[in-house]
Amino acid sequence: NQTANGLDRDYITQWSYGIDETWTLLVPNTKGGASAPLVNSDKAMEHADNQFMPVYQQLGQYWGDQPGTMGPVYVGAFVLMLFVLGLFIVKGGIKWALLAATVLSILLSWGKNFMPFTNFFIDYVPMYAKFRTVASILVIAEFTIPLLAMLALKKIVDDPGILTRKIKLVYLSFGLT
């Protein structure tokens, strides 16, 4: 399980993002939020029965695949809608580069949940075997998604009529997000 010149595969993939946890890009706290104890959440404890307080003190707010987290990776529904709309209305190669970087970062963040892909990168991509927290690669998606969303906004500002001409694509973007 040890890589030739790097870290142990289990160690590399310990902080893997869950496949279903990817929904946190769209919906915050899909997997419960941070790893902090449930009693630290005023909203959760608002209607809690005090007789179960010892149980609440042992429960974390997070139930995803990682050993723990300070909170989800969240981009937002509106930004994701603009990202998807940007895939339809932004012209040029930058759109495809941003989409590829986004998809690649999401797939790599899955780590142990997508081992054939992860093993390929560990074995053949220089320095990847020394990468400790694979979920942190989502910072790329957190950059590329808003960037394409901003390019979509620029297109809309430059050509306001595009929304009426491409109304079905606008509806599709809303529907997908």
Predicted features, each with a name:
Residues 43-57, 82-112, 161-172:
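Membrane-interface helix-loop-helix junctions at transmembrane boundaries of multi-pass membrane enzymes
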Residues 60-73, 104-144, 157:
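Membrane-helix boundary/interfacial segments in multi-pass membrane proteins
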